[in-house]
Curated annotation (Swiss-Prot):
Annotated protein name in UniProt: Uncharacterized J domain-containing protein C4H3.01
Residue ranges occupied by any J domain in the UniProt entry: 7-76
Keywords, in A-Z order: Chaperone, Phosphoprotein
GO biological process, one term: protein insertion into mitochondrial outer membrane
Organism: Schizosaccharomyces pombe (strain 972 / ATCC 24843) (Fission yeast)
GO molecular function, one term: Hsp70 protein binding
SMART domains cross-referenced by the UniProt entry: DnaJ
Modified residues (Phosphoserine): 108
GO-annotated cellular components: cell division site; cell tip; cytosol; mitochondrion
Pfam family for this entry, one: DnaJ
InterPro entries: DnaJ_domain (IPR001623), DnaJ_domain_CS (IPR018253), DnaJ_X (IPR026894), J_dom_sf (IPR036869), Peroxisomal_DnaJ (IPR052814)
Coiled-coil stretches: none
Length: 392
């Protein structure tokens, strides 16, 4: 293999020039999480620039044709036909991406993540201007007054921007629930219309099994299918038990509330765990001491990546299931005719069961992020089991 004329992209991803496609993807995904601006609040602009360079490197090296062009002629001759995609696309596609859009809509936490990034950069620029005003000359009473006025106006604008973002979030969620509800209604209506015979029912089961097998190969595909399946089966069983036993529906609703509470706790604790590890790593770097070997530091970085991913996935799952519960509830309201409501519940239970039974391929080399989370869970479980009991 000839030596590439330019190695900048390889250096950015920290890989050798003979790295395999899997090695390239692993390196990119690890760095994309590490340098995402949302995970670097102290320097969102610098992290954003680094993130974009990493993304650009992956888009070239991850494409066999572009990589060949890059190796032979350099990066000027290795540009995608449609241009480079931005960093937003990475996190949009991290949890399912376009193939799942019809099922769960666009994840709100991704949109909010980038809204906050833009706000942080804008606020940082405003603070720099205010600081320049103070440092430009002797801070006379007039300059101090100008500084205080600007600071006050900036705070007002910040509150207004926050209120605007919150309103946008509410409207985005309302629209997303509406679209997911409409898509689900079409699917349930189709199921009800075709499931009138044993042959039709078997054909539907085969159709959704094939669709699930297609979706499972997407990033976090199996996990998202399980999240969808859990909500569908829970909602379907609640309606069917309420119709048959009455009290059974009550216990199903209580069980659902318990799962929501657990999911909330998982999301919060995962975020706290990730932040603690990031803070520990930052303290180590701030000291500037070689307290850990390269191997130990690499393990720590990998552990942090796993924790960040776990926190991100917990947030994504919470987001997905919250929207799906609303969509299912819209289609199972008591004002819906009883017969139709029961048929929809049966259809939800069928589809949910198919999705819940999907299994991951343990040898799939593309399940890099998912396996990192799995390893992180194993470490947490092992750590909790290793803790000695408290003295009484």
């Amino acid at each position: 293999m000839a030596t590439p004329v330019d190695t900048e992209y390889y250096d950015l991803l920290g890989i050798s020039t003979d790295a395999t496609a899997v090695d390239i993807k692993k390196a990119y995904r690890k760095l994309a999480v590490k340098y995402h601006p949302d995970k670097n609040p102290d320097d969102p602009q610098g992290a954003s620039e680094k993130f974009q360079k990493i993304s650009e490197a992956y888009q070239v090296l991850g494409d066999e044709k572009l990589r060949s062009q890059y190796d032979q002629f350099g990066k000027e001759k290795a540009v995608p036909e449609q241009g480079f995609t931005d960093a937003y696309d990475f996190f949009t596609n991290l949890f399912g991406g376009a193939p799942f859009r019809e099922w769960v809509g666009e994840l709100s936490f991704v949109k909010e993540m980038f809204r906050e990034e833009d706000s942080a950069v804008e606020q940082g620029q405003m603070n720099d201007k205010q600081q320049l005003l103070l440092e430009s000359s002797e801070p006379t009473p007039t300059i101090k007054q100008q500084f205080n006025d600007r600071k006050k106006n900036a705070q007002i604008r910040e509150r207004e921007a926050l209120a605007k973002r919150e309103q946008e979030m509410i409207e985005d969620r309302r629209q997303r629930i509406k679209e997911v509800t409409e898509n689900l209604e079409k699917r349930l209506d189709d199921w009800i219309a075709k499931a009138t015979t044993e042959e039709g029912l078997n054909a539907l089961r085969e159709k959704y099994t094939q669709e699930a097998n297609t979706l499972r190969i997407e990033s976090f595909g199996v996990e998202i299918l399980h999240a969808i399946g859990e909500v569908y089966t829970q909602k379907g069983r609640t309606v069917l038990k309420s119709s048959k036993f009455g009290i059974g529906g009550f216990w199903s609703r209580m069980k659902e509330k318990g799962k929501i509470a657990r999911a909330t706790w998982d999301t919060v604790s995962a975020a706290m765990d990730a932040k603690l590890s990031i803070d520990q790593m930052q303290k180590l770097e701030d000291k500037g001491e070689d307290q850990a070997s390269a191997e130990e530091r690499a393990k720590l970085e990998l552990d942090i990546t796993g924790k960040i991913l776990r926190a991100s996935w917990c947030g994504a799952r919470y987001d997905i299931q919250g929207v799906l519960r609303e969509a299912c509830s819209n289609l199972l309201k008591k004002r819906v005719p009883t017969e139709l409501r029961l048929k929809r519940a049966h259809a939800l239970l069928e589809i949910g069961t198919i999705f819940s039974n999907v299994e991951a391929d343990p040898d799939d080399p593309n399940r890099i992020f998912e396996n990192l989370i799995l390893e992180n869970k194993k470490k947490r479980k092992k750590g909790s089991e290793a803790k000695p009991p408290k003295a009484t």
